A protein has these predicted regions:
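Flexible glycine-/small-residue-rich
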Residues: 11-12, 58, 118, 212-216
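P-loop NTP-binding site
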Residues: 184-219
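Conserved, well-folded catalytic cores of nucleic-acid-processing
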Residues: 27, 46-50, 65, 84-87, ...
Length: 219
């Protein structure tokens, strides 16, 4: 028996989606900074074993779009609801659960397994965490709720085991040697953009775009 499926990661900006994706895949697939909406594209990271293939998909943060690029980014997040076999909805210990109610309603109507992940629990205490679990359960009663700290790898092993249990029977969707759907040139531009956003603040526009004019891979 072989299992395979798409596990899509959604949630608001700056809750740790990209950090979680990198931890689950075991490679740095998505760049991460302290700035909201660092992720602009939908990026896949693929985990392969002999009898399993998990296709993770990181998406831009959900928010009301104010310009064309944000409209495109929201489209990526909404498309992740349409083709997921398992949905990971990521929040954190400081986020207001009532934020983006319209998007949450769409999540609540889905007929696939939804795992709600309360991230950054290392920045909270037990009492607040219990309150958050109760509030989120009232908003998404069908979702499984799992507290994690993606940065510290707390709860990620439990999450991975649960994903493997929920994964449907299916042949592999991608070659077993493939790690992502993006070419090397894409990751070069993303790494450069990550460094710009991390080390510069007001010196450059927040919506900076990196263009690599020439790229040559060493053999």
């Amino acid at each position: 028996m072989h299992k395979a499926g798409f596990v899509n990661i959604v949630g608001n900006p700056n809750v740790g989606k990209s950090t979680l994706m990198n931890q689950l895949v075991g490679e740095k697939i998505s760049i991460a900074t302290f700035k909201a909406q660092t992720t602009r594209h939908r990026i896949m990271g693929i985990v392969n074993t002999d009898d399993m293939q998990i296709v993770f998909s990181d998406t831009p943060g959900v928010l009301k779009p104010n310009y064309k690029m944000q409209e495109m980014m929201l489209h990526f997040s909404e498309s992740a609801l349409a083709d997921a076999d398992i949905l990971l909805y990521v929040t954190d210990v400081v986020e207001n659960p009532e934020k983006n109610v319209d998007f949450l309603e769409k999540v609540g109507k889905m007929d696939i397994p939804v795992i709600l992940l309360i991230n950054k629990i290392d920045e909270s205490d037990q009492k607040k965490l219990v309150e958050l679990v109760e509030r989120w359960h009232s908003l998404l009663p069908k979702a499984e709720i799992l507290p994690i700290s993606a940065k510290n790898k707390f709860g990620t092993d439990v999450l991975m085991k649960r994903i493997q249990e929920l994964l449907p029977e299916s042949p592999a969707y991608f070659d077993k040697n493939q790690l992502t759907d993006k070419p090397a040139k894409f990751f070069v531009t993303e790494i450069i953009r990550e460094k710009i956003l991390r080390y510069y603040d007001k010196e450059i526009p927040y919506s900076v775009e990196v263009v690599v004019e020439r790229f040559k891979e060493e053999t």
